[in-house]
Amino acid sequence: MEKVLKKIILASKSIDRTELFNRIDIPFEVQASNIDEEKFKKRISDPILLVKELANAKLLYVKGELIKKNSQALIIAADTIVELNGIIIGKAKNPEGASKILKNLMGKAHNLITGIAISNTDDPKIIIDHAITSVEFLTLSDSEIDNYVKTNEWKGRAGAYSINDKASLFISKINGSSSNVIGLPMHKIYEILKNDFGLNLFHM
């Protein structure tokens, strides 16, 4: 039997993830976590394990805050990284860093890896999963990369680009979930909610 859910909490301050939820027109609220991501990145080198651990940590933080308030909700947390030849590529801190990352990715296939963690506030069960999408770029000139960096789309984004915006002009191939490149593998979330929590997003 399908269950009725009063509230979904997206444990992320990412505008791209918020936009993904807005597109499917279901009620949700955003509550960002406050964890030290660098602590995890220093001790975990495996990209899949890293995104899973970060997603779980974000979920536990928000879940704890909601439980303190006796708030009933289902929480969805996520973390996305870019991986190229086994090396984790994070978010650029400045335009120079963004340019360096993009030059490294040009003409190559790289992986977008997203870890997700989902749980109810009234249930200790936590479902953790991940998705991998391969993305390939065209080869751009230095001036084209400089022009893209000036758009500031790189800010706060893994791999220093956003598929939703002008970066779509130089993405030549995607193998896997396109929504995962944005920040959430929506097919995974749909399946987990349906199979593990008895929820159907078509009936929200």
Where are these regions (language model features)?
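Anionic-ligand binding region
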Residues: I101-L102, G115-S119, D123-I127
